[in-house]
Amino acid sequence: MGKLVVQGGTVLEGEVEISGSKNAALPIMAAAILCDEEIILKNVPRLQDVFVMIDILRSIGFRVEFDENELKIKRENDISQEVPYELVRKMRASFNVLGPIAVRTGRAKVALPGGCSIGVRPVDFHLEGLKKMGFSIKVEHGFVEATFERRTDQVTITLPFPSVGATEHLMTTAALLEGTRVVIENAAMEPEIVDLQNFINRMGGRIEGAGTSRIVIEGVEKMQGVEYSIIPDRIEAGTYLVAIAASRGKGLVKNVNPDHLTNFFEKLEETGVKLKVFGNEVEIEMRERPEAVDVTTNPYPGFPTDLQPQMMAYLSIASGVSVITENVFKTRFLHVDELKRMGADIEVSGNVAIVKGVEKLSGAPVEGTDLRATAALLIAGIIADGVTEISNVEHIFRGYEDVIDKFSKLGAKIEYVEKEN
């Protein structure tokens, strides 16, 4: 495990190209289990989590080739019903292969998921939904076993919370339940779910309603091979936009879908940022100290929780007091203590953080606690006086393709240093 050494005080300027969305690619890769024919996915980011999912697909009988950003997936052997624990523990999205394997083979056994440690992520929503679709569920010794027992004509699943993972998992599983109509109420509405629907429908699925709170899936008998391009990563785009604004710079962010970031753009503009949108490119300029704004995270189309830590780093140097309310992951404030080490003035009470803007942050040794928190610390390091050393930095490589290279091309002074044994 290495660390990032960041020389602060740089102004970011230039162009940056946004990669394909990890959060769209992973569920689409899981959905490829539904098909025997070759799937070709384009615009796939080369990230640690993607490589874990590749290993999972290979372990259950699929041939996978990954060349640059193109992924080819085809079933080669009988689908294995069990996924090795050492793969599942690395990433929570791997749990979403449970339903697809079970619907293909009648049974699946998958370890309870790992991944980001930002509070409890119950898989109960997934399991209750699978039960309603006719699967029996057994949980013991850290594993979940799903066995298909009965087919039902009509199923309605109302999610207690619009969980992205549960929505994707249940959609994908239901797509191959021939003769069953599944309705998911209070579904998550994220763009990545629309992307998953579009992919499954291209394979021959019959899903409608993604992007709204009600998704209807008519199960089909089989899927066919397709070629499909993954949407751009809205969180990566937002991260670079915040970083450029925080450094009081100017840049062009390319390969963005602006419709996916409307709420975020509004908040940036409230701080004084100038934004211009040209098709799938966004020009940003910020030369002043930002104005404080209040931010409340909510499920899409609200302000994304995955951009809250980066926004907090930015608002830590704003003029005035910002109130940040976290409504999605209640414990998503692990970055606060690290930002305070750099001189930020932040107080947390429950799911609310009060951020009193300071003139400057100071470089300090800090520790990454999860993917987005580490991105926030990187932004803080870029705008701070002096040198910031971020340890436990491997998180960032799970969600940002070529992150050091992209930031360096914008003018950031960042070096990855291997930890000495």
Curated annotation (Swiss-Prot):
Please list the GO biological process terms of this entry.
cell division; cell wall organization; peptidoglycan biosynthetic process; regulation of cell shape; UDP-N-acetylgalactosamine biosynthetic process
Q: Name one GO cellular component term.
A: cytoplasm
For whether the record's keyword set contains Membrane, the answer is: no
GO MF, one annotated term: UDP-N-acetylglucosamine 1-carboxyvinyltransferase activity
Kindly indicate whether the keyword Cytoplasm belongs to this entry: yes
Task: State where the protein is found.
Answer: Cytoplasm
Q: Which residues form the active site?
A: 116 (proton donor)
Give EC number(s), comma-separated: 2.5.1.7
Q: Which SUPFAM superfamilies match?
A: EPT/RTPC-like (SSF55205)
Which residues take part in binding phosphoenolpyruvate? Answer: 22-23
Catalysis: reaction(s) = phosphoenolpyruvate + UDP-N-acetyl-alpha-D-glucosamine = UDP-N-acetyl-3-O-(1-carboxyvinyl)-alpha-D-glucosamine + phosphate
Report the top EC class in one word.
transferase
- What does the entry list as the binding residues for UDP-N-acetyl-alpha-D-glucosamine? 92, 306, 328
What are the alphabetically sorted keywords of the record? Cell cycle, Cell division, Cell shape, Cell wall biogenesis/degradation, Cytoplasm, Peptidoglycan synthesis, Pyruvate, Transferase
Give the metabolic or biological pathway.
Cell wall biogenesis; peptidoglycan biosynthesis
Sequence positions bearing 2-(S-cysteinyl)pyruvic acid O-phosphothioketal: 116
Belongs to which family?
Answer: Belongs to the EPSP synthase family. MurA subfamily.
General function of this protein: Cell wall formation. Adds enolpyruvyl to UDP-N-acetylglucosamine.
The entry's protein name is UDP-N-acetylglucosamine 1-carboxyvinyltransferase
Q: Which organism is it from?
A: Thermotoga petrophila (strain ATCC BAA-488 / DSM 13995 / JCM 10881 / RKU-1)
- Lineage from the top down? Bacteria, Thermotogati, Thermotogota, Thermotogae, Thermotogales
